[in-house]
UniProtKB/Swiss-Prot annotation:
InterPro entries: NAD(P)-bd_dom_sf (IPR036291), SDR_fam (IPR002347). One of its GO terms (biological process) is retinol metabolic process. Induction: Down-regulated in liver by fasting and rose by refeeding. Its EC number is 1.1.1.300. Retinol dehydrogenase with a clear preference for NADP. Displays high activity towards 9-cis, 11-cis and all-trans-retinol, and to a lesser extent on 13-cis-retinol. Also exhibits reductive activity towards toxic lipid peroxidation products such as medium-chain aldehydes trans-2-nonenal, nonanal, and cis-6-nonenal. Has no dehydrogenase activity towards steroid. Seems to be required for homeostasis of retinol in liver and testis. It comes from the Eukaryota. The gene is Rdh11. This is Retinol dehydrogenase 11. The lineage of its organism: Eukaryota, Metazoa, Chordata, Craniata, Vertebrata.
Length: 316
């Protein structure tokens, strides 16, 4: 009888505790009052989710914001929504397919011809747990989009970021990087492939890239940070029915895209973070990085291998 009554009361208990759980899990809010008139920002994957909320906040602060999206139609819808909400007409959509180096190079070429400055590069876009597939250039999709695509984009825009200093680069990683390993003999999933692990490997690559990039940018006025946005309801789960089911089951513990954008915004806007360039953040504070994520030898080798795969000079 007691068990039956407890079961009946469970919805009421959840109703009472859910707000407290949500408040606890959404901790970490960007409280910066920095305004951005005259500043230029690029946010990849900004047509939806965390990227759209990040772009919206930057636009609210007066920045010229470029939504770099694979789906231009969805990007235009997002841009109109952001313009309507913020009153900022300087929100633009440009085609960027991170699974195609030709598209990345075309985006960068057009942007550099269009803009004199770039102050914020938010490498937000990504894929998660997709079936084994390859990019237009033959890279495994996770490492190709999440790491190599943003690696190339950053390379192509870096001189503009230096010219516009102080400027910042924010790379979205994940708590999942703790499960990641960089196996150079299986970087493309040639010998063994797991969609979940491939995602984790690529998120570890984001952290290693941030770490190595920060070393190379020391004294340039450009700083870089990696972030874990939290567990966020987004379109990243579109390839996994299991993940979509888990997201629905544990909805209480899932952040909204706006909440998920807070750490990206914190790293992009908070004054005084320059000395922490190369660091990893979660919930708007420094976060623990896995052992391999702190390995400078692996970071340097991944840099060299990435340059080789993309046909880039090693010293940039």
């Amino acid at each position: 009888m007691f068990g039956f009554l407890l079961l009946l009361s469970l919805p009421f208990i959840l109703y009472l505790v859910t707000p407290k759980i949500r408040k606890m899990l959404s901790s970490g809010v960007c409280t910066s009052n920095v305004q951005l008139p005259g500043k230029v920002a690029i946010v990849t994957g900004a047509n939806t989710g965390i990227g759209k909320e990040t772009a919206k906040d930057l636009a609210q602060r007066g920045a010229r914001v470029y939504l770099a999206c694979r789906d231009v139609d969805k990007g235009e819808l997002a841009a109109r929504e952001i313009q309507a909400v913020t009153g900022n007409s300087q929100v633009f959509v440009r085609k960027l397919d991170l699974a195609d180096t030709k598209s990345i190079r075309a985006f960068a070429k057009d942007f550099l011809a269009e803009e004199k400055h770039l102050h914020l590069l938010i490498n937000n876009a990504g894929v998660m747990m997709c079936p084994y597939s390859k990019t237009a250039d033959g890279f495994e999709m996770h490492i190709g989009v999440n790491h190599l695509g943003h690696f190339l984009l950053t390379h192509l825009l870096l001189e503009k970021l230096k010219e516009s200093a102080p400027s910042r680069i924010v790379n979205l990683s994940s708590l999942g990087h703790h499960l990641g390993r960089i196996h150079f003999h299986n970087l493309q999933g040639e010998k063994f492939y797991s969609a979940g692990l491939a995602y984790c490997h690529s998120k570890l690559a984001n952290i290693l890239f941030t770490k190595e990039l920060a070393k190379r940018l020391k004294g340039s006025g450009v700083t870089t940070y990696s972030v874990h946005p939290g567990t966020v309801h987004s379109e990243l789960t579109r390839y996994s029915s299991i993940m979509r089911w888990l997201w629905q089951l544990f909805f209480v513990f899932i952040k909204t895209p706006q909440e998920g954008a807070q750490t990206s915004l914190y790293c992009a806007l908070t004054e005084g973070l320059e000395s922490l360039s190369g660091s990893h953040f979660s919930d708007c504070q420094l976060a623990w990085v896995s052992y391999q994520g702190r390995n400078e030898i692996i970071a340097r080798r991944l840099w060299d291998v990435s340059c080789d795969l993309l046909g880039l000079p090693v010293d940039w």
